[in-house]
Swiss-Prot record:
Statement: the UniProt record of this protein carries the keyword Cell membrane: no
Signal sequence coordinates: none
Transferase found in the keyword field: no
Function field: Plays a major role in antagonizing the type I IFN-mediated antiviral response by degrading or inhibiting multiple cellular factors required for either IFN induction or response pathways. Acts cooperatively with NS2 to repress activation and nuclear translocation of host IFN-regulatory factor IRF3. Also disrupts the association of IRF3 with CREBBP. Interacts with host mitochondrial-associated membrane (MAM) MAVS and prevents the interaction with RIGI. Interacts with TRIM25 to suppress TRIM25-mediated RIGI ubiquitination and thereby RIGI-MAVS interaction.
Record protein name field: Non-structural protein 1
Cellular location(s): Host cytoplasm; Host mitochondrion; Host nucleus
Example GO biological process: symbiont-mediated suppression of host toll-like receptor signaling pathway
Disulfide bonds: none
Family, as annotated: Belongs to the pneumovirus non-structural protein 1 family.
Transmembrane regions: none
Length: 136
């Protein structure tokens, strides 16, 4: 498998209901299998939760190529439309513009989101995450 290297993938988040609003997510992962990581991201579920003014972006994946703990990223986004009313959970539906002929991943890789979960599911996840982070 070879030695693992630290790879950074920048992904633009787009709100399908307001295409003018985007945010940038930087995923850092120790892996030497970027193509497989990209395939994994295409099947992942991305959670975004705003707690105490901080936006937590959590990518849920069962990938062996990039453990979940390595791709949890937190940032203080001030204008992220998918976080209205405290946060939405979106399912990753499409991963485009991510492959180059040389096998590298394009820095402008774009993700399209869909499928907002119910408020009860969102509240349950928010409570679990808040407990995990020690914020309640």
């Amino acid at each position: 498998m070879g030695s693992e290297t630290l790879s950074v993938i920048q992904v633009r988040l787009r709100n399908i209901y307001d295409n003018d609003k985007v945010a940038l997510l930087k995923i850092t992962c120790h892996t030497n299998r970027l193509i497989l990581l990209t395939h994994t991201l295409a099947k992942s579920v991305i959670h975004t939760i705003k707690l105490s003014g901080i936006v937590f972006i959590h990518i849920i994946t069962s990938s062996d190529y990039c453990p979940t703990s390595d791709i949890i990223n937190s940032a203080n986004f001030t204008s992220m439309p998918i976080l209205q009313n405290g946060g939405y959970i979106w399912e990753l539906m499409e991963l485009t513009h991510c492959f180059q002929t040389n096998g590298l991943i394009d820095d402008n890789c774009e993700i399209t989101f869909s499928k907002r979960l119910s408020d009860s599911e969102l509240a349950k996840y928010s409570n679990q995450l808040s407990t995990l982070l020690g914020l309640n």
